[in-house]
Amino acid sequence: MALGALLLILGILGTPLAPGARGSEAEGQLLKKLFSDYDSSVRPAQEVGDRVGVSIGLTLAQLISLNEKDEEMSTKVYLDLEWTDYRLSWDPAEHDGIESLRVTAESVWLPDVVLLNNNDGNFDVALDINVVVSFEGSVRWQPPGLYRSSCSIQVTYFPFDWQNCTMVFSSYSYDSSEVSLKTGPDPDGQERQEIYIHEGTFIENGQWEIIHKPSRLIHLPGDRRGGKEGHREEVIFYLIIRRKPLFYLVNVIAPCILITLLAIFVFYLPPDAGEKMGLSIFALLTLTVFLLLLADKVPETSLAVPIIIKYLMFTMILVTFSVILSVVVLNLHHRSPHTHQMPFWVRQIFIHKLPPYLGLKRPKPERDQLPEPHHSFSPRSGWGRGTDEYFIRKPPCDFLFPKLNRFQPESPAPDLRRFIDGPPRAVGLPQELREVISSISYMARQLQEQEDHDALKEDWQFVAMVVDRLFLWTFIVFTSVGTLVIFLDATYHLPPPEPFP
């Protein structure tokens, strides 16, 4: 029994360890060896004057948003930092072929690279993931980050604009004499000169399109750190993005154009409809609502006025003038000979000369035609039916009082006046017949005055129609030219073909 137990113990001790157990033990021994005398606060420079080279790369995972109001860009990125720490090198042959280790970020020296133009005061990365250490002493750290960086917004051509936003990274604690920055390599090992985007994992933004994404290393003099005059190095990543204007075209610009068309057709609406002022004021209030909605989208700056605000203001000015001119048209339409006398130049310009050029033609007045009487002088009919028809029908006023025109009234015909007012003996008519003729003459004068009054009132209405049509064509020209001038200017505002021309 004792012999069996002894053989079992010897068998267990003689069995080789599993590969995983041996690997874990080897990594543990290697970590203990590397970090026994390691100080993470000491810069990994063999000499005091040596500089530690740190390469910085950036992988863009998502352009989350660009807040024009707060001038802030939100991005989801992966920062790629790589440097050499001579204290973390070993010979793989002496440690079971181990070529890389993964250790916590707090246990090694970090170059203290932060986003300088952050907008929320948070300089740290989103997650302190482990660093990868290779046997040559190369240390690589790829922490993810949700950054909110400041971005100066140029609002002149909003919403047909493009923006140049930057992300500035630098070592916060070391100057260029201690830490040397450079752009990191791309996946092919070449020196990277732009932000890397992985097509398979990148999430496209629905409002912005990335045009260029270069990077640049700059040197800034005059930086005092540690009580001495030094230089600071910064790696700047540029995002040159162009706005996709479809949202504003459909929801803002197209309704504004339709409202402008309503303001134009105000001048095509007849004044008797009674809705000219209501339609104009409705269009003005609608544009005011659009202006208030856009005020929350653009930055509060006095450096420039966005192009869409220019168009809204231009449209509001036109609609305001349409309200004023509608008042003028209504004033002309409701004038009468009792209140206003039409000047000669108004008659010549707006009645005789201007209408043909505006596509207006005044219809000719139609006079009542007296039908030819067909009387039968039979004993049955006699004179009764013919005289009844004659006095029932309205005679033309010019039949009794012929005039050259209605605007220069003349006295009745001299022969008729002598016929009416002449001495009874000369006329030789009975008194009853003379009274009938006098009554007919009075009614003819009243009818003529009413006809002249209506004709002059129709002249004012026709002048109002001509002025309305003149304003219609004027507004069409001004609206078309103004819209083209405002928006054609934006077509020349394109991103540069090269990021650094």
UniProtKB/Swiss-Prot annotation:
Disulphide bridges, residue numbers: 151-165
Gene3D superfamilies found in the cross-reference section: Neurotransmitter-gated ion-channel ligand-binding domain, Neurotransmitter-gated ion-channel transmembrane domain
Compartments where found: Postsynaptic cell membrane; Cell membrane
One annotated Gene Ontology cellular component of this protein: postsynaptic specialization membrane
Membrane topology: Multi-pass membrane protein
Phosphotyrosine: modified positions: 390
A molecular function (GO) term: acetylcholine receptor activity
Listed Basic and acidic residues bias regions: 363-375
Top-level division of the source organism's lineage: Eukaryota
Stretches that traverse the bilayer: 245-269, 277-295, 311-332, 470-488
Region (Disordered) residue spans: 362-381
Keyword Glycoprotein: yes
Function: After binding acetylcholine, the AChR responds by an extensive change in conformation that affects all subunits and leads to opening of an ion-conducting channel across the plasma membrane.
Quaternary organization: Pentamer of two alpha chains, and one each of the beta, delta, and gamma (in immature muscle) or epsilon (in mature muscle) chains. The muscle heteropentamer composed of alpha-1, beta-1, delta, epsilon subunits interacts with the alpha-conotoxin ImII.
Family annotation (NCBIfam families): LIC
Protein name: Acetylcholine receptor subunit beta
UniProt lineage: Eukaryota, Metazoa, Chordata, Craniata, Vertebrata
